[in-house]
Curated annotation (Swiss-Prot):
GO annotation terms (biological process): glycolipid biosynthetic process; phosphatidylinositol metabolic process; phospholipid biosynthetic process
Main location (coarse class): membrane
Pfam family, one: Glyco_transf_4
Cofactor: Mg(2+)
Function as written in the Swiss-Prot or TrEMBL entry: Involved in the biosynthesis of phosphatidyl-myo-inositol mannosides (PIM) which are early precursors in the biosynthesis of lipomannans (LM) and lipoarabinomannans (LAM). Catalyzes the addition of a mannosyl residue from GDP-D-mannose (GDP-Man) to the position 2 of the carrier lipid phosphatidyl-myo-inositol (PI) to generate a phosphatidyl-myo-inositol bearing an alpha-1,2-linked mannose residue (PIM1). In contrary to PimB, the mannosyltransferase PimA is unable to transfer a mannose residue to the position 6 of the phosphatidyl-myo-inositol of PIM1.
Gene of this entry: pimA
Outcome when changing E274A: Loss of mannosyltransferase activity
Catalytic activity: a 1,2-diacyl-sn-glycero-3-phospho-(1D-myo-inositol) + GDP-alpha-D-mannose = a 1,2-diacyl-sn-glycero-3-phospho-[alpha-D-mannopyranosyl-(1<->6)-D-myo-inositol] + GDP + H(+)
GO molecular function, one term: phosphatidylinositol alpha-mannosyltransferase activity
Protein name, as recorded: Phosphatidyl-myo-inositol mannosyltransferase
Gene3D superfamilies reported for this sequence: Glycogen Phosphorylase B
Length: 386
């Protein structure tokens, strides 16, 4: 099968949707399918040979964060050219609401179209502006996928259409078998934080507020931080406890997996804006206990707290108590890890990709190819105005 995939977010920086798209493409290619991915990327970024750059992206407020997206007249022409030359059996558009390549592809294409909805919020001003323009194009989507019940419910409420729920995928073995980082396991306890720590919704402020109690109980505790941000500023915020922070910075997938395996606990103190919780799944696959904010998305991944400890959102004292409880009780920690290990296999790519392929096969059953829509060709000027 020839599959075209569109990712709206730039490959210049790592992100959950970008990772999902690349991993799905690799799994499908390994299964013998031909895959082409269209995504924003700067000229200096090294891309797999199956990824076509849609051009350099610009930062735009989206989903309570800042996403790097791509749009404009030249981009619209590039999207149409990619569709016309792709001869795709299926076009899989990720985040069709994002004002980027995904929105342009949905406008320009017709035929067997699948869309995956990753987010579950409409907080973006940009999205609210484009929503009225986008509504008619949603009728083109034949197969709808939501990565979580939250994303599915949002689609039903905002767009009036249902979707099949298929979660994000993880290569469970790559996390379970990852080597430890050099110098690990440490004699002291290690708590992992992963994400953009200068983005408020990731909740680093909650973990920092919990740190004094952690240090009082475990004087040699280490907060292992993986992700982007201002190290000097965070050290200043930590004050006298800055010595307990270790920064790895932005790392590749292999190092991330090793960091997961090397920690005693993965802490996810997020404040909101999450529709799934892929990093929790990765920690579960690595055999690392999870302590997370009691967000709806996290609660579903952790089976209402059976596969990991849930803490009220923005509760530093509760986070400290939960982390201390798991760090000082090996049996409790092992129980969470064992139950998480049983649960995590439902997220393995072998399971998830098979579910996605069934959607592809359903929408492409008539043998019609994806092509540039007649409306897009007739109304070039209107299309470029998007």
């Amino acid at each position: 099968m020839r599959i075209g995939m569109v990712c709206p977010y730039s490959f210049d920086v790592p992100g959950g949707v970008q990772s999902h798209v690349l991993q799905l493409a690799e799994v499908l290619r390994d299964a013998g399918h031909e895959v082409s991915v269209l995504a924003p990327a700067s000229p200096h970024v090294k891309l797999p040979d199956y990824v076509v750059s849609g051009g350099k992206a610009v930062p735009i407020p989206y989903n309570g964060s800042v996403a790097r997206l791509r749009f404009g007249p030249a981009t619209h022409r590039k999207v149409k050219k990619w569709i016309a030359e792709g001869d795709f059996d299926v076009l899989h558009i990720h985040e069709p609401n994002a004002p980027s390549l995904s929105m342009l592809a949905l406008q320009a294409a017709e035929g067997p179209i699948v869309a995956t909805f990753h987010t579950s919020t409409t907080k973006s001003l940009t999205l609210s502006v484009f929503q009225g323009i986008l509504r008619p194009y949603h009728e083109k989507i034949i197969g709808r996928i939501a990565v979580s019940d939250l994303a599915r419910r949002w689609q039903m409420e905002a767009l009036g259409s249902d979707a099949v729920e298929i979660p994000n995928g993880v290569d469970v073995a790559s996390f379970a078998d990852a080597p430890l980082l050099d110098g690990y396991p440490r004699e002291g306890r290690t708590v992992l934080f992963l994400g953009r720590y200068d983005e408020p919704r990731k909740g680093m402020a909650v973990l920092l507020a919990a740190l004094p109690k952690l240090v009082a109980r475990f004087p040699d505790v280490e907060i292992l931080i993986v992700g982007r941000g201002d190290e000097d500023e965070l050290r200043e915020q930590a004050g006298d406890l800055a010595g307990h922070l270790r920064f790895l910075g932005q790392v590749d997938d292999a190092t991330k997996a090793s960091a997961m395996r090397s920690a005693d606990v993965y802490c996810a103190p997020h404040l909101g804006g999450e529709s799934f919780g892929i990093v929790l799944v990765e920690a579960m696959a690595a055999g690392t206990a999870v302590v997370a904010s009691d967000l709806d998305a996290f609660r579903r991944v952790l089976a209402d707290g059976d596969a990991g400890r849930l803490v009220p959102v923005d509760d530093a004292d509760g986070m400290a108590a939960a982390l201390i409880g798991i760090l000082e009780d090996d049996q409790l920690r092992a129980g969470y890890v064992a139950r998480a290990s049983e649960r995590v296999h439902r997220y393995d790519w072998s399971v998830v990709s098979a579910q996605i392929m069934r959607v592809y096969e359903t929408v492409s059953g008539a043998g019609i190819k994806v092509q540039v829509s007649g409306a897009a060709n007739r109304d070039e000027t209107a299309g470029e105005s998007v």
